[in-house]
A protein has these predicted regions:
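Catalytic alpha-helical scaffold of carbohydrate-active enzymes acting on polysaccharides/glycoconjugates
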Residues: 1-132
Length: 132
């Protein structure tokens, strides 16, 4: 079985990590997920893939994985709601230093903060996301 794995390196046009030639904002993601949904893809996590590989689980007929590697707050506030509207979840890989180090003295106002906080990360997990 072939499983497409998408990797999103930066999702915010204002973020230094996002490639400037093709920013992946909420509108582009909506179109992207609409196409995947129209083609019949169903999202899976690495845990589901591992369970299938070990013979302990099944995969949907057309699995797809959506990976994100920067825990920016727009993943929770913009991208996850779009994904959820199509029944999708993602795999988020977190570099914890920004969460633990940057905000050690307290959280800045929401409009100044760029990274996820633990509460938002837990909420993504409750939505079915894999956090790695």
């Amino acid at each position: 079985m072939k499983i497409p794995i998408t990797m999103c390196h930066g999702t915010d046009p204002e973020d230094a990590f996002t490639p400037k030639k093709m920013p992946l904002d909420a509108d582009r993601f909506n179109r992207y997920f609409a196409i995947a949904h129209e083609l019949g893809f169903e999202s899976i996590t690495y845990n589901e893939l591992a369970a299938w590989r070990s013979g302990e689980g099944a995969l949907p007929p057309r699995p797809i994985m959506f990976d994100f590697d920067h825990a920016r707050k727009n993943i929770y506030h913009e991208i996850a709601p779009v994904m959820q509207s199509y029944g999708y979840t993602g795999n988020l890989f977190i570099f914890t230093e920004p969460v633990e180090g940057m905000y050690a003295g307290g959280l800045p106002p929401d409009d100044e903060r760029v990274d996820l906080i633990w509460e938002e990360t837990r909420s993504l997990m409750e939505m079915g996301w894999l956090i790695g």
